[in-house]
Each structure stands twice: as structure tokens, then as C-alpha cells.
Amino acid sequence: MLRNGSIVTEFILVGFQQSSTSTRALLFALFLALYSLTMAMNGLIIFITSWTDPKLNSPMYFFLGHLSLLDVCFITTTIPQMLIHLVVRDHIVSFVCCMTQMYFVFCVGVAECILLAFMAYDRYVAICYPLNYVPIISQKVCVRLVGTAWFFGLINGIFLEYISFREPFRRDNHIESFFCEAPIVIGLSCGDPQFSLWAIFADAIVVILSPMVLTVTSYVHILATILSKASSSGRGKTFSTCASHLTVVIFLYTSAMFSYMNPHSTHGPDKDKPFSLLYTIITPMCNPIIYSFRNKEIKEAMVRALGRTRLAQPQSV
């Protein structure tokens, strides 16, 4: 308990405190398995796309490599702490650690939302304007787009961090979640949280809603182009790919919108937890499966990398 007037120096995450020992053990095993699988898949994509393979020397694979890097950063920001709190009895996190975690969630989350929009635009140009693809999406443009996503993530993280911690914290320090989530933390501050929540809402329109509109618009144009030109078999394959991409993207955008585009805080923590789990765990795990492992060139690059590894083993003995 905090004494009246005392300044908060630490927070208590109570997301799993009410869970039984058996439930925490089950959640620990589940989250550890999902985290390990996600790290392995995204790590493999980073290795494959950064590996000097001429067939993967295109903007799309450059985007995929950075998407996997963002997913690794994003899931590492939250899951390791969750695993620790499922084992230990004290769920205390320092004020500085909470600020740091929130910054990286903001930074990486915003960068990924923007990058996914750029990736959708890349596919739009490649399919709808194939003859102009190289001039429009050159290597220089590709690097600038990725740099823009990272830059806006870094800058936006600073802005949202200031908005979240502009008021002092002298009240309750119990966070009803399994990590430091901005809307809940803001509700613990001394001042009126509505200004900060509205600022986050306005910011989310720019960094979440706008990329989502660009992404959906790009895929709608892709589908329209394919339906007018491709054969029936080509239509089915492209429709399946676009549908799977849109599904993952909508999961990310809608779950983030539900958590951050809610200035009146009408949703309780228990209702928000599934959405938080969706964009912190499920999306980073699904991205490599949907975007990379279904790609023929990625599969062939994995086979070539495995073949080179096997050939190198006898020489090292």
C-alpha cells in the first residue's frame, strides 16, 4: 500500500496474481513454447533474408527481414517478464523498467504498423504496375521506407512516453495487466487521465488507423487487378495469399485499436487482456508463417542454406 502523498517508485503487475498454481504452470509452459517458436521462426527469417542469396536480393525480402526483427523486439519486450512473473511470487516492476517497457512497446508497435502498410504498398506496385516496379520501389526507396518506419516508431515512442508520464503517480500502483500497458498506467496518475487518453487516441488515428486504411486499400486494388487479369488457378492462389495477409494485419490493427483508441476507458482490464495477448504474442508468431514460410523463394533458400551447412560439416571435422 502507498502512503498518502508518497511518490510511486514501482508498480505491481496483478495480471496473473489471481491465477492458481496449476494455471500459472500451464501458462508458463504455453508462453515459453510460443516465445521459443516465435524467436526461432523470426530468427531463421532474419538469417535467410540477410544471407547473401541473389534470389532474395529484392525489396520484399528486405521488408520481411525487418518485419521479423521488429517481431523479435516486440515479443522480447513483454514475454520474458511475463514468464518470470508466472514463476516468482512478487510481481513488482520498477518505475524506470515500466517506462522502458512502454517505450519499446510504443516504438516497435508503431514501426510495425507502418512497415506492414509499406509492405502492402510494395505488393500493390509489384502486381498492379509490374513494369514500373523497379523504378518505383528501388533499393534506395526501400531503405528509406524501412528507415521511415523505424524513425516514426522512435519519435512516436518519445511522444507517447511523455503523454503517459506527464502527471505524477501518488495513488494506487497496481496495474491490472500482465505488462505495463499505457491506458491502464495512465489511469493510475494523479491528474485527469482524459487528456492523455485523448492524445493517444489522436495519435493512434495517425499511426494505426491510417496504415490500416492504406494496407486494406492496397490489397483491395491487388484483388481487383488479379480478378480482371489472372486465370482461375492464379486467382485462387492470390486470393488465398491476400486473405491470409489481411487476416494477420487486421488482427494486429484491431487489437491495438481496441486497446489504445478508447479515450473513455470503457473496457475493463479483463476484457482487454485477450486483445493484449493477441498483438503481443499471436501476431509476432503468425507473421513469419503467413508472410515468409508460405513463400516459395524463402523455402528454397532454407533448403540451400541447410545444404551448405551439411556440406560444411565434414570439412570442419
From Swiss-Prot:
Compartment annotation: Cell membrane
- Membrane disposition: Multi-pass membrane protein
Main location as per UniProt: membrane
Q: Which CDD domains match?
A: 7tmA_OR2-like
Superkingdom per UniProt = Eukaryota
The chain's Extracellular topological domains, given as residue ranges, are 1-25, 77-100, 162-198, 260-272
Of the GO CC terms on this record, one is: plasma membrane
Annotated disulfide bonds: C98-C190
Keyword list (alphabetical) reads: Cell membrane, Disulfide bond, G-protein coupled receptor, Glycoprotein, Membrane, Olfaction, Receptor, Sensory transduction, Transducer, Transmembrane, Transmembrane helix
Pfam family of the protein (one): 7tm_4
A Gene Ontology biological process annotation? detection of chemical stimulus involved in sensory perception of smell
Residues passing through the membrane, by range: 26-46, 56-76, 101-121, 141-161, 199-218, 239-259, 273-293
State which residues carry a glycan (glycosylated): N4
Cytoplasmic side, ranges:
47-55, 122-140, 219-238, 294-317
Q: Which GO terms describe its molecular function?
A: G protein-coupled receptor activity; olfactory receptor activity
* Signal peptide as annotated in the record: none
- Do you know which InterPro entries this protein is assigned to? GPCR_Rhodpsn (IPR000276), GPCR_Rhodpsn_7TM (IPR017452), Olfact_rcpt (IPR000725)
Q: What does this protein do?
A: Odorant receptor.
Q: Which family does this protein fall into?
A: Belongs to the G-protein coupled receptor 1 family.
What protein am I looking at? Answer: Olfactory receptor 10AD1
Q: Which organism is this protein's natural source?
A: Homo sapiens
Question: What's the source species' lineage?
Answer: Eukaryota, Metazoa, Chordata, Craniata, Vertebrata
Gene behind this protein:
OR10AD1
